[in-house]
């Protein structure tokens, strides 16, 4: 109801604006509304099948000043990091809440790592605690994912800090590609599912900032500063394509076109945002190819909305590819 009321107000205001600004205002409203549609499936019990060897670890993060909960399924020395969406919860990772990912990667020869928390974080190192929502520490997710957690897992779970895959959806799609851009030994494989792949361009900083504010009251200026700050480009996969090409990172990029199929997701925000996101994904593919990139899989099917069933379908589809690249298993089951 709150979302519908916001939309009515914004559609009324938009009539007074120029066309480009009208599109941005409506897009921002839908983006903020979609945060609830996609990620706000708060339930107390995660999806893991009973009997799977899923552990709940508390990994120290000196940079953030507290332990971070990790859902972990051991399966090999190489691992798949499954990153969450904008409304990441503090109890379980969204991949476990909304998909059978642990089951799908059981006996794959790969360990599965699901960090818990990080709402609106973009899994990035922020400048300061979020201003306006009372956050008492500074997000340092990049430090945690690339230094603190890998060291702990190597010492305690025999998971190597090199030769892993980062898989992200929506918010974390860009995060996965950025992690691979700057840490190629740790992440020779990165997958973005319906990710925002050019966040520093045009109206994206504004839309991202408003969506973050809607999802926990987080302040994008506390993350990367104003849109003119170099941190926005530093964390922009489109800008960092030369790094991905030079690293020869294996990338998997997926985005639907907003048309639902039998998997569902037939609601206005999910359809609109996926169609809005598709254009930056297509530009990313063209720019990647023009930059000499030859190690990517790009899936842009004639269907798919911004919702979990489509992302899970891609996670299953990429499993043999991940196994081959990471050499984590000869079993493609």
Curated annotation (Swiss-Prot):
Q: Which top-level enzyme class is recorded in the Swiss-Prot or TrEMBL entry? A: transferase
Spell out the Gene3D superfamilies in the cross-references: alpha/beta hydrolase
Its Gene Ontology cellular component terms are: extracellular region
The signal peptide stretch is 1-44
Quote the record's binding site residues for substrate.
86-87, 170, 198, 276-279, 306-308
What functional role does this protein have? The antigen 85 proteins (FbpA, FbpB, FbpC) are responsible for the high affinity of mycobacteria to fibronectin, a large adhesive glycoprotein, which facilitates the attachment of M.tuberculosis to murine alveolar macrophages (AMs). They also help to maintain the integrity of the cell wall by catalyzing the transfer of mycolic acids to cell wall arabinogalactan and through the synthesis of alpha,alpha-trehalose dimycolate (TDM, cord factor).
**Protein name from the UniProt record:** Diacylglycerol acyltransferase/mycolyltransferase Ag85C
Query: Gene behind this chain?
Result: fbpC
